[in-house]
Design a protein with these regions (language model features):
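Extreme N-terminal starter segment of soluble prokaryotic enzymes
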Residues: 1-4
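Short polar catalytic/cofactor-binding loops
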Residues: 8-12
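Short acidic loop-to-helix transition motifs that present clustered carboxylates
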Residues: 36-40
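FMN-binding flavodoxin-like domain, especially the glycine-rich phosphate-binding loop
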Residues: 13-16, 20-35, 47-156
Length: 156
């Protein structure tokens, strides 16, 4: 079984969440590929059994959309590209709004035909406005991400 994790990260916190989810998948024997959204090929997403999409939470989007590279990746996918595939979303924020970004990602993945495992993790890390990197995710959030990976592997 193979999983693809697509993410965008300005300060490294969303990448860290992707790595934590990957560890949970790996524990269950899933082969994981992690790619930056801006460099990933949306046409190849259907080559994987599981697709995970992660984005930081930016206040300027009013918590309605993922980061632009993530949105562009999902928008470039063909309708029903994920039919028969398992998918999930995750987001990282310094303050609030991550749950809404996760829900927006999940809605888009479902519109592409995926069976969405919900809710994906909303991780607390970083600093408001990304003026500095801020603190890393706490142990509870790291475990939440790993558990989400294990859950996806079990449901696949």
């Amino acid at each position: 079984m193979k999983a693809l994790i697509i993410y965008h990260s300005k300060t490294g916190h969303t990448r860290a969440a992707a790595d934590d989810i990957a560890r949970g998948l790996d524990e269950k024997g899933v082969e994981v590929t992690i790619e930056e959204a801006a460099k990933a090929d949306p046409a190849k997403a259907s080559d994987y059994d599981i697709l995970l999409v992660g984005s930081p939470t930016y206040a300027q989007t009013r918590y309605k959309a993922a980061a632009k590279p993530v949105e562009r990746f999902m928008d470039a996918m063909k309708p029903d590209a994920l039919s028969g595939h398992l998918a999930g979303g995750f987001s990282v924020c310094a303050a609030s709004g991550a749950e809404k970004i996760v829900a927006a990602i999940e809605k888009k993945l479902a519109s592409l035909g995926a069976k969405v495992v919900s809710p994906g993790p909303a991780v607390r890390a970083g600093a408001p406005l990304s003026l500095w990197q801020g603190p890393d995710a706490g142990a509870a959030d790291v475990e939440k991400c790993k558990e989400f990976g294990r859950r996806l592997a079990t449901e696949a």
